């Protein structure tokens, strides 16, 4: 690959208009997230339409534990990419390659250990979560094979994170789109044609993610000369592993700690019966689709803040946060209007019109959540910025705030108020996290400025 071609692939986010850079980076990432949610929705639609409401509830009842485990993987891999982005921003390419190599070693070890432990505990976890008896077998069939595919999740997210750390947010999207289409085709094959039940949805997800990870690996080897390593750069390094774990593990724990609250909520939902589970499943699938822009802005700000922190450009980080928050705020208003008006129609994608209770409850869930999308914007933009700046512990504490809010709702309020309070669990979590993140960001900014002044 020529130097000019490589420069066109890699994006330096330490120079240029912050708003344009953020939009230019976030839009391709958004396309990938939308396709990811699209095939996730297709999974749910096929399960709901072809296998019925109980099967829909079976898959939905695993969403919180799935988020906790796979969220840890995604968080760890995102954290691994931050030292890569910082070294790239500092133009220290040799050290950057050491981080890339050691990220591969750690990801491989984590993948093997997690797969064994989680697969052995899957059934018991579902029992602890009070999964209804009529759906627990379908839930187990689905989530066991999803967890067996944890290595594929590590493969894709580690490599995609490294590619994005170098400023290329488009290529992982292309591979994700391809894997999304493959996932849909495999869903139809396994569920409709072969009749593998809920396990078929898991087969499709794991295979398609493995394909996208392999494509990322091939692309990196062929297209990034800057990542071509000498033998000594591939060796395990205690210093690099420490830094990677210092960034990755806290970010993974951030996801998992947040998800613990979701597990408590899911347990509370399970106690309300399969109709409530199906309602929240439909609402969450739709809501996750509409929340993709917030995730894209967050992922963008991790790279943006990482590169600019590495380059010592603290003022640009503040400008980027302002721009990203404004973009997210404008979108939040539009999304709220759409979900309030049409939230009673979209659930028909997942269930028959005769399931009036499911449709009504899903609409309530979407409406109340969308009213708080501006606080969600702050959670994603400001937390990922703090993470990119290198303050991983503070990002974890924000996750603790979310966990506390959701746990309080699940343990204390659901037994009293029932389904309606489920609709406010996430909004309360976002508000409590914001109360922590806003002052935390200004602390991080002040600390970085003082560090920069001391070094100068």
Residue ranges with predicted function:
Residues 56-116, 153-172, 279-343, 376-398:
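Small-residue-rich hydrophobic transmembrane alpha-helices
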Residues 1-26, 84-149, 193-249, 305-372, ...:
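Short alpha-helical transmembrane segments in multi-pass integral membrane proteins
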Residues 77, 145-164, 172-180, 201-214, ...:
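Short runs within selected transmembrane alpha-helices of multi-pass transporters and secretion channels
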Residues 68-71, 115, 183-187, 213-217, ...:
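Hydrophobic transmembrane alpha-helices of multi-pass small-molecule transporters
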Residues 34, 38-56, 126-133, 189-196, ...:
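Helix-terminus/linker motif at the lipid-water interface of multi-pass membrane proteins
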Residues 15, 19-38, 42, 65, ...:
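Residue-level signal for short hydrophobic patches within transmembrane helices
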Residues 24, 47-67, 133-138, 198-201, ...:
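Interfacial/gating helices of multi-pass transporter permease domains
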Residues 24-43, 145, 156, 179, ...:
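Transmembrane helical elements of multi-pass membrane transporters/channels
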């Amino acid at each position: 690959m020529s130097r000019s071609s490589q420069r066109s692939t890699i994006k330096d986010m330490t120079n240029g208009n912050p708003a344009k850079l953020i939009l230019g980076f976030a839009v391709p990432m958004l396309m990938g997230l939308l396709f990811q949610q699209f095939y996730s929705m297709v999974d749910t639609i096929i399960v709901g339409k072809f296998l019925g409401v109980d099967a829909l509830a079976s898959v939905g009842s695993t969403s919180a534990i799935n988020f906790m485990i796979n969220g840890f993987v995604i968080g760890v891999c995102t954290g691994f990419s931050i030292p890569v982005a910082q070294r790239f921003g500092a133009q220290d390419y040799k050290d950057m390659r050491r981080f890339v190599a050691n990220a591969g070693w750690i990801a491989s070890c984590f993948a093997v250990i997690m797969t064994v432990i989680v697969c052995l505990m899957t059934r018991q976890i579902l029992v602890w979560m009070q999964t209804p008896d009529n759906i627990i077998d379908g839930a187990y069939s689905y989530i066991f094979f999803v967890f067996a595919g944890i290595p594929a999740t590590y493969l894709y997210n580690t490599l995609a994170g490294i590619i994005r750390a170098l400023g290329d947010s488009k290529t992982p999207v292309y591979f994700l789109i391809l894997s999304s289409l493959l996932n849909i085709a495999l869903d139809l094959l396994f569920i409709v044609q072969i009749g593998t039940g809920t396990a078929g949805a898991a087969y499709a997800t794991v295979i398609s993610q493995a394909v996208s990870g392999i494509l990322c690996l091939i692309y990196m080897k062929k297209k990034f000369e800057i990542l071509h390593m000498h033998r000594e750069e591939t060796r395990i390094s205690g210093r690099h592993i420490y830094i990677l774990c210092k960034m990755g593990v806290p970010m993974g724990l951030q996801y998992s700690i947040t998800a613990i609250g979701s597990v408590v909520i899911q347990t509370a939902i399970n106690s309300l019966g399969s109709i409530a589970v199906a309602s929240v499943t439909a609402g969450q699938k739709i809501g996750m689709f509409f929340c993709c822009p917030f995730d894209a802005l967050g992922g963008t700000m991790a790279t943006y803040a990482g590169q600019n922190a590495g380059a010592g450009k603290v003022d640009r980080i503040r400008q980027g946060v302002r721009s990203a928050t404004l973009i997210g705020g404008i979108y939040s208003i539009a999304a709220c209007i759409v979900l309030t008006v049409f939230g009673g129609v979209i659930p028909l994608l997942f269930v028959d019109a005769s399931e009036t209770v499911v449709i009504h409850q899903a609409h309530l869930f979407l409406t109340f959540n969308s009213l708080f999308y501006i606080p969600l914007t702050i959670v994603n933009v400001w937390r990922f910025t703090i993470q990119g700046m290198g303050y991983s512990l503070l990002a974890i504490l924000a996750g603790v705030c979310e966990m506390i809010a959701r746990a309080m709702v699940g343990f204390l309020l659901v037994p009293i108020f029932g389904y309606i309070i489920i609709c406010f669990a996430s909004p309360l979590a976002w508000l409590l996290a914001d109360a922590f993140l806003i002052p935390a960001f200004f602390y991080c900014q002040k600390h970085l400025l003082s560090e920069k002044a001391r070094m100068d």
